[in-house]
UniProtKB/Swiss-Prot annotation:
Source organism phylogeny: Bacteria, Pseudomonadati, Pseudomonadota, Gammaproteobacteria, Pasteurellales
Domain of life: Bacteria
Species of provenance: Haemophilus influenzae (strain ATCC 51907 / DSM 11121 / KW20 / Rd)
UniProt KW keywords: DNA-binding, Repeat, Restriction system
Gene that this sequence comes from: hsdS
Keyword Metal-binding (UniProt): no
Cross-referenced InterPro entries: Restrct_endonuc_typeI_TRD (IPR000055), Restrct_endonuc_typeI_TRD_sf (IPR044946), Type-I_RS_S_subunit (IPR052021)
Pfam families: Methylase_S
Name assigned to this protein: Type I restriction enzyme HindI specificity subunit
Subunit structure: The type I restriction/modification system is composed of three polypeptides R, M and S; the restriction enzyme has stoichiometry R(2)M(2)S(1) while the methyltransferase is M(2)S(1).
Keyword match Transcription regulation: no
Domain notes: Contains two DNA recognition domains, each specifying recognition of one of the two defined components of the target sequence.
Length: 459
């Protein structure tokens, strides 16, 4: 490291406060500290300027580093890799502008999100008096950083960036896979396309055979001519499609109930409480004062672990076997469905292995494992997310959906036959999603192993 030089953070960057020009953009995207996590935007919603809070003041540009002043160990940071002219960010962010003559912006970002720097920021934050741990740029500007020449910086980036790119590609693939599963779920269980196609055909005076053909069209998206060709070229697939269409009812009926007055559902389908579909478990946090309860054995899921995750494969905290067994009734198996119910309400994920959660999460252990995907997608519907938040509001500042209320939430439930058919169609999507998530965990571990050695000049 003889050619590496020591700088303070203040030597190679500054905390910039560019005033956002609201006259240029009547509609903006406001980014608060809770809207980013581990270099990803969680929310990017357009807002009218008149609806913005007072802390919406800072403009950003490509190459900036956003880093939350509040609780710096929580991963609320982001590298701005595009021009985002209509984005305004909270004053609770440090907007760090690197000195490009000394350090590449991407390289400084790697330094700032390293475990060593994060621990330093946490120490500074916790040493300051206040309602919650907080840093300012001035309080951390003396942080000592070893910086190589820019050519070496680029070589390090060339090693780390492909890992990040592969992780991002897997993430995008998973998002696409989930959209495919969501589209099928919506067609079958929200819009009831196969049932409505049958009902309309019968209403038009067609035979039951013709009605089932109409349902086959709705399910497959094929024309009658294409279905005829399918029956000849792929008879097994055609027969499977016919059996699927046959499983759907022919009629829509009104369901009376507090939450669904006047709503039509397929005949024979029922409104069932979540507690009728599985065991409901509210998590619990073992005592932090007992160090034996924490280790590397059992995932301990908290709400930040759930963001944008179909399957939870990585957690910031883990329990020891001792800690997990101390509250053994809180164990949830693989393919349990976790729902965030306090503060950030409505996140839904599935476990990838036996786990525990904290008390902000209610989980469903499905009675029938083949219903996992159906239950997951039911709880992921936008209308359900809104309903969960409405139930949790209760007139208090902090959203809180208790376990009793959560257990009584009802969802439209078809016959087991249809649930099994649906599971068969989407299970490969979920298996591929899990595989990608596990690969991302492995790539992250490789990255985290390499990064400190690269940043210390050991490689």
């Amino acid at each position: 490291m003889s050619d590496w030089k020591e700088y303070s953070l203040g030597d190679i960057s500054r905390n910039i406060s560019r005033r956002f020009d609201f006259n240029a953009y009547p509609n903006v995207v406001f980014i608060n500290t809770g809207d980013v996590l581990n270099n990803k935007f969680l929310h990017c919603e357009i807002s009218n300027v008149k609806d913005l809070p007072g802390q919406a003041k800072k403009a950003i540009k490509k190459g900036d580093i956003l880093y939350s002043e509040i609780r710096p160990g929580n991963g609320r940071y982001l590298f701005v890799d595009n021009d985002l002219d209509n984005y305004v960010v909270s004053t609770k962010f440090m907007v760090i502008e690197p000195n490009a003559n000394i350090v590449l912006p991407e390289f400084l970002f790697l330094l700032l999100i390293s475990n060593e720097t994060t621990e330093y920021f946490k120490m500074i934050a916790e040493s300051r008096s206040g309602t919650f741990p907080q840093i300012t740029f001035d309080s951390v500007s003396s942080l000592s950083l070893n910086i190589p020449d820019k050519e070496t910086q680029q070589k390090i980036l060339d090693i780390i960036t492909p890992l990040d790119d592969k992780i991002e590609l897997n993430t995008q693939i998973n998002q696409t896979l989930e959209q495919i599963a969501q589209a099928l779920f919506k067609s079958w269980f929200v819009d009831f396309d196969p049932v409505r196609a049958k009902a309309q055909a019968l209403s038009d005076g067609m035979s039951l055979e013709q009605a089932e053909l109409a349902a086959m069209q709705a399910i497959s998206g094929k024309t009658p001519e294409e279905l005829t060709a399918l029956s000849q070229t792929q008879p097994d697939r055609y027969a499977e499609l016919a059996e699927t269409a046959k499983a759907f009812p022919c009629e829509m009926v009104e369901v009376d109930g507090v939450e669904v007055d006047g709503v039509e559902v397929p005949r024979g389908w029922e409104m069932k409480a979540l507690s009728d579909l599985g065991q409901i478990i509210c998590g619990k946090t073992p005592s932090k004062s007992n160090k034996e309860f924490y280790g590397d054995d059992v995932p301990f899921i908290k709400i930040p672990d759930m963001h944008n995750q179909v399957f939870i494969t990585q957690t910031t905290d883990n329990l020891s076997v001792v800690g997990a067994n101390y509250q053994s009734k809180k164990y949830i198996p693989a393919k349990s469905i976790c729902v965030s119910c306090i503060a950030t309400v409505g996140l839904v994920s599935m476990t990838s292995k036996p786990s525990h959660t904290n008390q902000q999460i209610n989980s469903i252990i499905p009675d029938d494992e083949q219903s996992c995907e159906f239950l997951y997608l039911s709880l992921k519907q936008p209308s359900m997310t809104k309903y969960l938040k409405d139930l949790a509001s209760g007139g208090t500042a902090t959203l809180n959906l208790n376990t009793s209320t959560f257990s009584k939430i009802e969802i439209i439930t078809p016959s087991k036959e249809i649930i099994y058919i649906f599971q068969k169609k989407v299970v490969s999507i979920f298996e591929k999603t899990l595989s990608n998530s596990i690969e991302n965990k492995r790539l992250t571990e490789i990255r985290d192993l390499l990064l400190p050695r690269l940043l210390n000049g050991e490689i």
